């Protein structure tokens, strides 16, 4: 099954095309805003036509609300045009899997900047071949993460090293996302895809258009 994985929840946006466990092609860019261009780049590298994609996996965050919304909109449009399977996966889960690949073992705090001096925090137990959630995702204050960092706890996350001196920068990766999706079958329709966001968003939807007669 060919899976197109789209991970836009951090500053490093990435897309990967997988066939089973094999990564056929992948591409990433830092600070970019391309979507279709990245997709076409990956498909071209893999020598694959759009019609060959059977499933699209989307990283649902938490993280960059704009990036996640863009990835969801892309997946929704693709499903409407080609009737592919869609699956959404937590970007924090992908970060835990990425930490496992990087041999970051033990109790690990996955931390993502939530703005306003708050952070998304989840704790995982990570060992070779497995990772398990110990503390579910929640919002935490800057002071709490700073205390954990000062106590020598392992902390990883996107661009988190600029906040906490002992923390390691780690980014969600589309190839990891695609491999996580391969083991899942909980496909959903595009209108059910929503970002993981633990507080009311500052983004407001525009009101419906009024018909002027």
Features from the language model and the residues they span:
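Short, conserved active-site loops that position catalytic residues or coordinate cofactors/metal ions
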Residues: 37-39, 70
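DPxDG-like acidic metal-binding loop motif
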Residues: 55-86, 91
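Short glycine/serine- and small hydrophobic-enriched flexible loop segments
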Residues: 40-41, 76, 80, 179-183
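Short hydrophobic beta-strand segments in globular cytosolic domains
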Residues: 23-24
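Oxyanion-binding and handling regions
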Residues: 1-20, 30-33, 37, 87-213
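Phosphate/pyrophosphate-binding loops at sites that engage ATP/ADP/AMP, CoA/4′-phosphopantetheine
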Residues: 39-55, 148-153
